[in-house]
Amino acid sequence: MSADYSSEKFKATHLFDEILWHFRSNLSLKTNRRGLATAENSFSGKEAVDFLMIEMPRIIPNNVPERDKMQKFLEFMMDMNVISEAFPKKVKQRRPFSESRIYLFMKTLDELKHPKPRSRRSASFSGARKSAKVAQPASPAATMHRPPKARLPRRLSRSNGNIDKAGIDNSSGGVENHGFDDHKDDEIPKKQRTPKILNRSLESICTEEYTEKREVSEMKEKVYDWLPFFKSRRNHTKVNQPTRRSASLDRNHCVLEQEKAEAALRSQKVTTPPIREAPKDVVFMHPQGPLPAVPSRYQNHRTSIAGSNPALLSRGRMYESIMRRSSVVPVADSVQANNECSFWKTELLGRLEQIYDRTLPCEWASKVDGYDIQWNMIEIDHADGIVKSRCQGLQPDYPQTVIQFMDYLVRYPFVTHKKMDTGLEYNVNRIFITLVNRLEDLNAPLQFDECSLIVNLLCKIDSFAAMLDNGPARRWSKVMISSSASSIEEAGLMVDGFSRDLPACGIRASKYRRRALSPFDNRVNLEIQDEKSYEIREQWLIEAIQLVLLSLPTSRRRKLHKFVTFIQSIETNAVFDLADPSNGSSNNREAAIIGLWTGVCSKCRKQQGMLITAVLLANFQSLFAVPVEFIEQVKRLECEEKDRYSGPRYAKITRSRNDWQPPVPDKPQASPAVFKKPLREVACEKTKKGLFTRLLRK
């Protein structure tokens, strides 16, 4: 594969870059004059066209150049801001290329390959006046000679602009922003002034004691030079100023001191034994395998800002719950585990494709992990019925403030538990509003791929398809949003009246908040039907959504299960009333669906997210159940695969009476049409209760 990957693959791009580079470096430049203004290093349009007519056959052999094509090429270079007019007219639209006009280059040879670094806008440059680089203005008018009293463009900032000297300022250092300058050379420093004599009778006072105290204070002040909040005036009297930006952007002083101590130890050739983690450490119990040894300089809480590698840091509790790092080196026995887990992924995708009756999305299928499926189906906590965590220790699924708000609403009115110590007396509606707005900025358990797959499955039922097609948002119903809002105006209102207590600046605060809002759909109050209309009676649809939820990563499966349980506890709590007429909710159930759907789904329309949330609430026990028949089928295939590879030269292990025996295989079902039954049979049919349902009853 490395032999196929060469520059021949991008021949047009390399050829275009070569033409630009050759044109910029070899075209003869001179000083042109028009009226009272002159432009150095400029050229006429006719000279550029003649140059291309001569040089283009040398770059591209067997090619006859035409003057019209060369003019179009120079027009394209004007669009790419490579060249521009030296004496432009004050018109809004740029004039087309002409051979009679004068042009100059807007980019140097280095800028054609590497863009210029731009400095950050800051209120203080502190020690950065030698190292800061400010981008030069793109206006070609800055390179012209002007008469002394010519009008300059009205630019208020004095940091970078109004350059009235010929040519571009090619100095390596940046332009000082005198608007933020904090000292004057003519002014005497405050410490060097003579003391102000308030009483004229003390004019014979001796100033020698004052000068001695000033020297002592300067000696004390040098102790704090390493602090990150030193003033920018500190080094302005020194000849050689430091080139670093500021101490707050550099590495921590404690880390520097520790590195100096390590360098001193190395110079003395004193070797210390390496740090080894205990073999029974918690990190080694993680299913993804152990981490490399942590360097000694990261053992303290202060870590280096410059050049810190997150993959080498020790795994924290919060970090475990957020993501499973792919940079962790797996253990040696993981190959066999992955081979065994491939049965789970293959069977789940095959069964789901059989029910879906079409090809599954490749983006979603490639992210499914067989280990997650096996863990989600087998490792279930018998206390609450939620799948166990794959990490050791405590893993919070949400930030601590969100957990406190959810705990407050679940345990309200605190009859059997201790009241939450928040320090303030919160109102229930105020807590709920804050929780709604916080959830918009967090990652939801159901991402874009899962949401689109569940919506397509629900649209196979006419009643659910009608819910998406009806209403004022009909033209947006089947459009999944996959990118952030293209403009600020699209943000509009936030989620339905729950955000009235937030300031206006909070609308643009989060990309997830903008992504959840659409220009039309999410502003409209959508009608929520009764709970029975969201119940699923088709067994094939229940099984399909079960498999989609079981294919989630374990952390997201746990998060979704806990959050839907939390919504159920809110909608059944009759002590408080969360209904708000401004968003169309008349009871707690409607208010929870309207406000909390962003905690279930992400990157989808409001109508689709509310439908998925309502379906999960109405069919909670059946959708979060574990299909026992599917587990038995996969285990049977695993046993057949093991028996196939066990040869006659190895003695077969006799199974005891308690070992699992494969049941009789079921007949395969072809498509969702096989599952369709008459209305009488559907009415009389009782839904099969799985293992998870029996656990919930206990």
From Swiss-Prot:
Consequence when changing R515H: In or204ts; temperature sensitive mutant. During EMS blastomere cell division, loss of nuclear rotation resulting in the transversal localization of the mitotic spindle
GO cellular component, one term: cell cortex
Chain positions covered by the region annotation Disordered: 115-188, 653-672
Basic and acidic residues compositional bias, start-end: 178-188
Single biological process term from Gene Ontology: intracellular signal transduction
Principal location listed in the UniProt entry: cytoplasm
Domain DEP: 23-107
Localisation per UniProt entry: Cytoplasm; Cytoplasm, Cell cortex
Keyword presence, Cell cycle: yes
Keyword Transmembrane helix: no
Family annotation (PROSITE patterns): DEP
Biased composition regions of type Basic residues, renumbered to the chain: 146-157
Alphabetically ordered keywords of this record: Cell cycle, Cell division, Cytoplasm, Developmental protein, Mitosis
InterPro entries: DEP_dom, WH-like_DNA-bd_sf, WH_DNA-bd_sf
Pfam families in the record: DEP (PF00610)
Function, in words: Required for the proper orientation of spindles after the establishment of polarity. May play a role in interactions between the astral microtubules and the cortical cytoskeleton. Required for asymmetric forces on nuclei and spindles. Acts downstream of the PAR signaling as an intermediate that transduces polarity information to the machinery that positions the mitotic spindle, possibly by regulating force generation. Regulates gpr-1/2 asymmetric cortical localization during the first embryonic cell divisions. Acts antagonistically to the gpr-1/2 signaling pathway.
Protein name as annotated: Protein let-99
Organism per entry: Caenorhabditis elegans
